[in-house]
């Protein structure tokens, strides 16, 4: 067992990597190219496309942060990406509060909305609310508040995970990253309007929009009690 078990594990891992990794890598690259092309659209449509696509990438078992880093996603497109990621994380966290209570709120709101993937596979309609929320907050970020994420590009794909997305926006205000400076960004003193936009787009609006849209989905019978339950999260001590 000491020899066979590690050998089998290594061989299976290598075989799967050889057969499965290439198509997964190709799909991820294609997805990244779609996001890259979306950044060339007008601010309104770019806000919708980038917000929705990067938000979806955040919840999928792929790395939205890596995609944003590779694409060097900063500026107004980075702001839209932050909006989309926050919509997914805060949206799922708040609209599933009834099922998951405080443990689910923290694990999804500050951790990752990827925890909902098993539920999404079972019932894809649970994904409607946070995705539509991201389609709303994205253009609000780009067209109303002109929210830019000029910190490290990786923060564009982090959302509220450890508050990295919000911190990236703030650091971009006071000390833009090299990638952002190369695109013309400069340090600035954020105004109250800037802070209001960040808080509304990243936290308040997703916390309101996603539950409201999910309520409509529930009334239509698309989402039922228990569809958003996180079986793997232990939150007894947080109740």
State the predicted function of each range:
Residues 2-7, 23-38, 182-186, 232-233:
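Hydrophobic transmembrane alpha-helices of multi-pass solute/ion transporters
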Residues 1-13, 17, 47, 51, ...:
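Alpha-helical transmembrane segments of multi-pass membrane proteins, especially transporters
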Residues 215-227:
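Membrane-interface capping segments at transmembrane-helix boundaries
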């Amino acid at each position: 067992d000491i020899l066979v078990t590690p050998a089998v594990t290594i061989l299976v891992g290598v075989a799967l990597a050889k057969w499965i990794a290439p198509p997964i890598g190709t799909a991820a690259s294609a997805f990244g190219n779609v996001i890259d092309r979306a950044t060339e659209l007008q601010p309104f449509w770019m806000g919708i496309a980038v917000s929705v696509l990067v938000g979806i990438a955040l919840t999928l078992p792929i790395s939205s942060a890596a995609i944003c880093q590779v694409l060097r996603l900063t500026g107004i497109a980075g702001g839209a990406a932050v909006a989309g990621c926050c919509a997914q994380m805060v949206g799922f966290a708040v609209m599933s509060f009834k099922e998951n209570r405080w443990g689910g709120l923290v694990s999804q709101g500050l951790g990752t909305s990827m925890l909902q993937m098993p539920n999404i596979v079972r019932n894809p309609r649970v994904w409607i609310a946070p995705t539509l929320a991201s389609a709303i907050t994205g253009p609000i970020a780009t067209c109303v508040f002109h929210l830019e994420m000029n910190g490290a590009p990786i923060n564009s794909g982090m959302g509220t995970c450890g508050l990295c997305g919000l911190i990236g926006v703030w650091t971009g205000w006071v000390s833009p990253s090299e990638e952002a400076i190369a695109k013309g960004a400069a340090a600035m003193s954020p105004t109250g309007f800037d802070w209001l936009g960040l808080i509304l787009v990243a936290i308040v609006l997703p916390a309101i929009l996603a539950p409201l849209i999910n309520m409509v989905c529930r009334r239509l019978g698309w989402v039922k009690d228990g569809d958003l339950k996180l079986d793997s999260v232990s939150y007894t001590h947080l109740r």
